[in-house]
């Protein structure tokens, strides 16, 4: 029985020693992150869709900060994200990538042909914003309010029943941009 306790104590001491060495090394050899990259990464929508040409939002933020990449390539973030990045970097806002001529592109949303859906859940696993709901071997559907139109759910579908379709702007689908609405605060007088 003593041999077991000796082995437990030895392994515990080794774990403690190696943990202390790793803790010291992580602080001693730490690499400082670029604070500009961190701020840009916080502004980006974190959908990891790859529409900007980079595998995720962090690599795109690094490319903007370090390589001078254009700030207008984030499709899910749109103009709001581009304007925030332009303000952060003190650069001129640019027209969104690929739409220099058109002012507001049609918003695309994934649509599942429920007659052909086999319920494999591959689209649910691929969706970075959890806009697709359903269960194994059950009908799946897309919550259009959450869908960013990133196209990541289309390729994994084995029956090819997912397509991106433009959404017509209706009073139900139109989003108020509260930052562009002028708001004036009117002081209230209190009478005693």
Curated annotation (Swiss-Prot):
Cofactor note: Binds 3 [4Fe-4S] clusters.
Entry's Gene Ontology cellular component terms: plasma membrane
Span list, region Hydrophobic: 1-26
PROSITE patterns: 4FE4S, 4FE4S_FER_1, 4FE4S_FER_2
Membrane spanning residue stretches: none
Binding annotation for [4Fe-4S] cluster 2: 117, 120, 123, 157
The keyword Transport belongs to this UniProt entry's keyword annotation: yes
Stored PANTHER family: ION-TRANSLOCATING OXIDOREDUCTASE COMPLEX SUBUNIT B
Name under which the protein is recorded: Ion-translocating oxidoreductase complex subunit B
Organism: Escherichia coli O17:K52:H18 (strain UMN026 / ExPEC)
């Amino acid at each position: 029985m003593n041999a077991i306790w000796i082995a437990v104590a030895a392994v515990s001491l080794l774990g403690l020693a190696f943990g202390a060495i790793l803790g010291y090394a992580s602080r001693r050899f730490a690499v400082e992150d670029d604070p500009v990259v961190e701020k840009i990464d916080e502004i980006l929508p974190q959908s990891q869709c790859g529409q900007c040409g980079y595998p995720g939002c962090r690599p795109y933020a690094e490319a903007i900060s370090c390589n001078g990449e254009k700030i207008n390539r984030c499709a899910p973030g749109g103009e709001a994200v581009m304007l925030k990045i332009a303000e952060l970097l003190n650069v001129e806002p640019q027209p969104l990538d690929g739409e220099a001529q058109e002012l507001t592109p049609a918003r695309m949303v994934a649509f599942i042909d429920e007659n052909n859906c086999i319920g494999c859940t591959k689209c649910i696993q691929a969706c970075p914003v959890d806009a697709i709901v359903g269960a194994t071997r059950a009908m799946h559907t897309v919550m259009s309010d959450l869908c960013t139109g990133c196209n990541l759910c289309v390729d994994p579908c084995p029956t090819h029943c997912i397509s991106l379709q433009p959404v017509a702007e209706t009073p139900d689908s139109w989003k108020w941009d509260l930052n562009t609405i002028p708001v004036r605060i009117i002081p209230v007088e209190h009478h005693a």
